[in-house]
């Protein structure tokens, strides 16, 4: 009997939080996720004197992206994009990396640093080759309503070791891509003006 009383007294003395009858606070922010599609226009980064072999230098295509924002002003972006030229030439990228954003009412400017894999398809489907690739980008998301967003963005890509691995290619490869798209928002509080939404 005394042992049980002593253990109870020690437990309540050492852990006073056990005496509280209030509930623990709940999380105040939900995870925000967007999934969207893009239409892209690109300068493929091919030297202008290579148009005889590689065709036109204004590529067009599209892609998909997803953003996951676990905290205010910081998130993660994943994207896949493919742009097409002529002569069977196309460029495809698979990227992931951090993004940083600010909120101003319905406007959300952002910047991102992505890394991933890039694939170049050579003229007339002769061959394709993959490279490690890095991207610096930025843009603006505009909230139409609680679930739909419009996006405009620019990306500068650097395909590492392209110029050294591709024989007789006129220089390195650094595509520039402008994209416009729309996304659907899941979770979070899209109508809140605090934090992101």
Residue ranges and their predicted role:
Residues 1-7:
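Bacterial N-terminal signal peptides that target proteins for export
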Residues 8-17:
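Bacterial N-terminal signal peptides
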Residues 20-70, 76-83, 115, 177-197:
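Short glycine/proline- and aromatic-enriched beta-strand/turn motifs that initiate or cap beta-hairpins
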Residues 45-53, 57, 88-94, 121-129, ...:
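Outer-membrane beta-barrel translocator domains and adjoining extracellular loop/strand segments
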Residues 58, 130-132, 156:
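Ser/Thr- (and often Asn-) enriched beta-sheet segments in non-cytosolic proteins
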Residues 65-134, 142-146, 175, 179-186, ...:
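Gram-negative (and chloroplast) outer-membrane scaffold detector with strong preference
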Residues 115, 140, 154-156:
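Hydrophobic beta-strand positions in extracellular immunoglobulin-like domains
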Residues 136, 145-197:
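Predominantly the C-terminal beta-signal and adjacent terminal strand-loop region
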């Amino acid at each position: 009997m005394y042992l049980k009383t002593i253990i109870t007294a020690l437990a309540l003395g050492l852990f006073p939080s056990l005496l509280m009858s209030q509930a623990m606070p709940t999380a105040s922010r939900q995870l925000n996720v967007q999934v969207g599609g893009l239409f892209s226009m690109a300068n493929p980064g091919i030297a202008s004197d290579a148009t005889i072999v590689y065709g036109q230098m204004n590529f067009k295509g599209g892609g998909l992206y997803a953003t996951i924002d676990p905290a205010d002003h910081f998130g993660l972006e994943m994207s896949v994009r493919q742009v097409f030229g002529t002569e069977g030439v196309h460029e495809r990228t698979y990227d992931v990396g951090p993004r940083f954003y600010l909120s101003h009412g319905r406007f959300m400017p952002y910047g991102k640093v992505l890394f991933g894999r890039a694939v170049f398809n050579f003229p007339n489907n002769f061959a394709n080759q993959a490279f490690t690739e890095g991207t610096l980008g930025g843009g603006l998301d505009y909230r139409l309503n609680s679930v739909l967003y419009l996006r405009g963005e620019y990306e500068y890509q650097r395909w590492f070791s392209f110029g050294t691995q591709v024989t007789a290619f006129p220089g390195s490869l650094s595509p520039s891509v402008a994209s416009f798209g729309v996304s659907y928002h899941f979770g979070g509080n899209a109508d809140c003006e605090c934090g992101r939404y």
